[in-house]
């Protein structure tokens, strides 16, 4: 099978995507497929460079990658691809829409408000949410332009920074607890990982630098594990996920809260999904093979 590994892109997460793509290529080649690296520098590259491939493995992150646009182009070209479809990808990229659906489905998530300009910051609403808060681009990833703000004085500057990366900004209550991630493969949860960043929170450096954080497989207490698994599965169903996603949560006082869903989780050597799969004996090559197999089974 001729597999095109699509990477690069036009988002702020381009470098992360290129790293993911290189790792994916290295291990897909072990499976004896014909691998074609497809580096995207501008949107129209997808139409041109994807011609003639049998399958697209998406190693993209951020806008024009995780937001459903590339998925829509590939469906138009009748090229099967890895991961979730356009609708789920678009919703999960929009943190505000994701949280609205979670709230409607009675899935725990931290309180938040969204703003689209410095002028419409509602300081009273933020006070109700309670400080400290995270200020971040509504559709960003990899914690780019994400800041932990401890009082009213820091809000304006943090919003201005986030608005450089997106037209909308999320201001979300900081729920202090243990950060965990649940990797879902074909609707089943792999072992849970605890994320223990060496910084104050799991920022860009903690995510991608060697030694930026400790990520360890943990065995949760039985009742908590059941709650976490039920919540991860509820996210999968409510947001109509397919093939694989990563559900990030915070556990506070024994109660899990969903932070966000990643529809194209990172695939670098430091990435969480391969670590979780490895804990049940699934090698990186086997994981990639499963993603290809399950993706081909999805009716688009």
Swiss-Prot record:
Q: So where does Mg(2+) 1 get bound? A: 248, 260
Could you state one GO cellular component term attached to this entry?
Answer: cytoplasm
Which keywords accompany this UniProt record?
Answer: ATP-binding, Cell shape, Cell wall biogenesis/degradation, Cytoplasm, Ligase, Magnesium, Manganese, Metal-binding, Nucleotide-binding, Peptidoglycan synthesis
Enzyme class, UniProt record, top EC level: ligase
**Gene Ontology terms for molecular function:** ATP binding; D-alanine-D-alanine ligase activity; metal ion binding
Binding sites annotated in the UniProt record for Mg(2+) 2: 260, 262
Q: Which cofactor does it need?
A: Mg(2+); Mn(2+)
Residue intervals of the ATP-grasp domain:
99-293
Compartment(s) of residence: Cytoplasm
Q: List, in alphabetical order, the GO biological process terms annotated in this UniProt record.
A: cell wall organization; peptidoglycan biosynthetic process; regulation of cell shape
Catalysed reaction equations from the record: 2 D-alanine + ATP = D-alanyl-D-alanine + ADP + phosphate + H(+)
Q: What is its EC number?
A: 6.3.2.4
Quote the pathway field. Answer: Cell wall biogenesis; peptidoglycan biosynthesis
Check the record and name the NCBIfam families matching this protein: D_ala_D_alaTIGR, PRK01372.1
* Matches recorded under PANTHER family: D-ALANINE--D-ALANINE LIGASE, D-ALANINE--D-ALANINE LIGASE B
* Sequence similarity: Belongs to the D-alanine--D-alanine ligase family.
Q: Function of this protein?
A: Cell wall formation.
- The name under which this protein is listed is D-alanine--D-alanine ligase
Q: Which organism is it from?
A: Clostridium botulinum (strain Hall / ATCC 3502 / NCTC 13319 / Type A)
């Amino acid at each position: 099978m001729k597999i095109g590994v699509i990477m690069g892109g036009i988002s702020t997460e381009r470098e992360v995507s290129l790293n993911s793509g290189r790792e994916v290529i290295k291990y897909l080649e072990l499976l004896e497929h014909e691998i074609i690296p497809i580096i995207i520098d501008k949107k129209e590259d997808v139409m041109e460079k994807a011609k003639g491939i049998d399958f697209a493995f998406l190693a993209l992150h951020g806008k024009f990658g995780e937001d459903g646009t590339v998925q829509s182009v590939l469906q138009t070209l009748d090229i099967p691809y890895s991961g979730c479809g356009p609708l789920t990808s678009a919703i999960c990229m929009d943190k505000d829409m994701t949280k609205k659906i979670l709230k409607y489905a009675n899935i725990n998530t931290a309180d938040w408000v969204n703003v689209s300009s410095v002028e419409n910051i509602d300081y009273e609403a933020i006070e109700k949410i309670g400080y400290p808060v995270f200020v971040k681009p509504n559709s960003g990833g990899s914690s780019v332009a994400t800041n932990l703000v401890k009082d009213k004085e820091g809000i304006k500057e943090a919003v201005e920074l986030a608005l450089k990366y997106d037209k909308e900004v999320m201001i979300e209550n900081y729920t202090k607890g243990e950060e965990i991630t649940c990797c879902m493969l074909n609707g089943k949860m792999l072992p849970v990982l605890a994320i223990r960043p060496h910084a104050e929170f799991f920022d860009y450096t903690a995510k991608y630098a060697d030694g930026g954080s400790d990520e360890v497989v943990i065995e949760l207490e039985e009742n908590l594990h059941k709650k976490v698994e039920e919540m991860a599965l509820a996210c999968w169903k409510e947001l109509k996920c397919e093939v694989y996603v990563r559900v990030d949560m915070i556990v506070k006082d024994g109660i899990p809260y969903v932070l966000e869903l990643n529809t194209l989780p990172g695939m670098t050597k430091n990435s969480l999904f391969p670590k979780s799969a490895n804990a049940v004996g699934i090698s990186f090559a086997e994981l990639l093979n499963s993603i290809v197999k399950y993706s081909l089974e999805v009716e688009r």
